[in-house]
Amino acid sequence: MAQKPKVDPHVGRLGYLQALVTEFQETQSQDAKEQVLANLANFAYDPSNYEYLRQLQVLDLFLDSLSEENETLVEFAIGGLCNLCPDRANKEHILHAGGVPLIINCLSSPNEETVLSAITTLMHLSPPGRSFLPELTATPVVQCMLRFSLSASARLRNLAQIFLEDFCSPRQVAEARSRQAHSALGIPLPRSVAPRQR
């Protein structure tokens, strides 16, 4: 288990966040990386940290972590992005950094928490209405949402249904249904996991 970064108490929040980022970049321990990324994702929940997190390029750290093979790192990274993206500046950074395809890739994760955060992040990146990015509602994404809307998990099923109703046109849903009927889409539904004990 990673130790708390050694931070001068007079350095404050920015110093503490900088120590976390430095520890993430320097440690070789996967457990330490997971713990640090979880901490950063939790700090991303507080809007008073947004400016510090942008300054320390934590959004890019989260985006880079979406490509990791370690599912836990991916879960915490998408959770951090989900916490950050309601803010306009953070949303613009994610969009301009090419984050949408990385987030869409998270829809195929076997981890339900990762998928839920990915769907929520996509929803935050595109407000309801017809002025959203086409890639957010591309046919493969809509097909995923159709599959998720049939999930045994109420959270996944309900979130997918909201996405389909609020972010997709009836034409997009009909087209995705039509294509899905003619394809062998084999992406398994994510598995539910019990909440982690910390």
Curated annotation (Swiss-Prot):
Keywords: mRNA processing, mRNA splicing, Phosphoprotein, Repeat, Spliceosome. It holds the Pfam family Arm. Coiled coil: none annotated. One of its GO terms (biological process) is RNA splicing. SUPFAM superfamilies: ARM repeat (SSF48371). The modification Phosphoserine is found at S169. The keyword Protein biosynthesis does not apply. It comes from the Eukaryota. The keyword Phosphoprotein applies. One of its GO terms (cellular component) is spliceosomal complex. Gene3D superfamilies: Leucine-rich Repeat Variant. ARM repeats lie at residues 57-99, 100-140. As a component of the minor spliceosome, involved in the splicing of U12-type introns in pre-mRNAs. Component of the minor spliceosome. Within this complex, interacts with RBM48. This is Armadillo repeat-containing protein 7. It comes from Homo sapiens.
